[in-house]
Amino acid sequence: MKKQILFICCAVIAYCLSACNTAPQQAPLKEKNLPKHVILIGFDGLSAHCLNNGADMPTFRKMMAEGASTLENRSILPSSSACNWASMFMGAGPELHGYTEWGSRTPELPSRVVNSDNRFPNIFGLYRDKAPEAEIGYIYEWEGMNYLVDTLAMSFRKHAPMSTENPNGCTPVAVQYIKEKKPNLCAIIYDQPDGTGHGKGWSSPEYFAMVNHLDSCLTQVMDAVREAGIMDDTVVILAGAHRGNQTGAGGQTVKKRAKPLPFSWKKRKKRFQVPRSTQG
């Protein structure tokens, strides 16, 4: 069965964003009712294990029920944060884009190809090239995420870490941005439950409490999409970078690499189980 590094996520984004291109020199697309917006939500360290072992996450489960999903999406190797997010954003593995470590800020290996900004191509820059007027947002909690994207492609970029004073992290910023700007492409990347998994353990009560809290953040983002009046034209994708074991990460076991991947769009088949091997 064919494996894909960026799998359906890249295909859906490319497919959806092609609908926003109105360049006069191109013939109009034959397909109708294509989505106009893509919201990519990332929960760093989210595991399939927690969903199979008691995590409530009602909004997450509703996404699975109303769209397409798999609980067997595998991280790349090594299964740690920066190199996995880079692979999802760039549609290639570390051997090509060159980001190989947990905290990579620049490629440890020379990128196989680079764009005009001397970076390996990523979905944000590629979309900006295709749709110069598009609204593209990037909201993130972990500072390391800033080094994995084409920042020049962003219409809006905000670092909003989760803290005791700000327990919802980047959620308030994302909610306001979605309501005001109705972005064509927006990535909202949380630093949790990764921190709790490393600090307390990937099967700890604290980890399960955190993923349920993140589900409430997901609810707020989904409500914002709805209140912005764009729900029917929006694909929402939820992705995780990796999982760990006990308090570690980066291993080669399926338990450390398996993570969930749901897609939600009102105009597509419900409860669809993604049949292909997926990786990213």
What are these regions (language model features)?
Residues E143-K158, P172-S216, Q220:
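Active-site His/acidic residue clusters
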